[in-house]
């Protein structure tokens, strides 16, 4: 067993190809264990409040409906663009974080502020690079028919009906959301790691395990806090991604709701959801998201640090 290093710390200098590869590994690992939860979460976000049973039974309602009407394989709908999304996003996020970390270190920002700023830039970069895969995944997951949609067909439909902007529908909102998420996640992660490092020598021996537990939970804590704060923005973005779909009326019993979004921007759609469905609708799927966030962020950070450790041997 090796001592876990913090290769994301201010001043760390890791080769670009190593951060790119390690980020891809961490993204693929995270995706492999969370795909079914991701599918349920997106289905919940895309369904207006009046379309489901009370909050406590929403997850089971969606899961039972999918198994009954679409089969068990439906939990992996959109898995190819989803996997490409995670790999691309993970590679871009960690490699750009390392790059910005290197170039912003000379500015002498306080360590916690440095992590927050670098995390924001990494979030913007990874969002832009991976966003078309996110749009494809959302539309493929929205398919509630037994037969899966062709990825190439969906790409052609988006290009034909919406052009290049169709692949970036809601991208500005996404950059805002992901920038906040990355800033909060990396900022919290580094704050906890720095706190643990600073208190390691002064902590009593019988309380060392508490510090170690906190240290190893840094990524998970950061992910949970970020998800709670930004989840409403993600819900609005999902609806923007789906509202212009060619298959809207076929895949959704609530096409009239989406029709009311036509011509609206991010803020207007958010206000429309609040007015017609209430604030709880913006948090539809939050329990699944948090359940997914814990393993995702843990595996993501652990996978990245582990991959970097072994790549440093070469």
From Swiss-Prot:
Q: Where in the cell is it found?
A: Mitochondrion inner membrane
Query: Pfam families from the entry?
Result: Mito_carr
- One function term, GO molecular function aspect: thiamine pyrophosphate transmembrane transporter activity
Q: Which GO terms describe its cellular component?
A: mitochondrial inner membrane
Q: Which residues form the signal peptide?
A: none
Origin, by domain of life? Eukaryota
The protein's topology relative to the membrane is: Multi-pass membrane protein
- The question of whether Transport is a record keyword is answered with yes
Under the heading InterPro entries, the entry gives: Mit_carrier, Mitochondrial_sb/sol_carrier, Mt_carrier_dom_sf
Alphabetized UniProt keyword annotations: Membrane, Mitochondrion, Mitochondrion inner membrane, Repeat, Transmembrane, Transmembrane helix, Transport
Q: Where are the Solcar repeats?
A: 14-103, 110-195, 210-310
Its GO biological process annotations read: mitochondrial thiamine pyrophosphate transmembrane transport; thiamine pyrophosphate transmembrane transport
What this protein is reported to do is described as: Mitochondrial transporter that mediates uptake of thiamine pyrophosphate (ThPP) into mitochondria.
Q: Which family does it belong to?
A: Belongs to the mitochondrial carrier (TC 2.A.29) family.
User: Which protein are we looking at?
Assistant: Mitochondrial thiamine pyrophosphate carrier 1
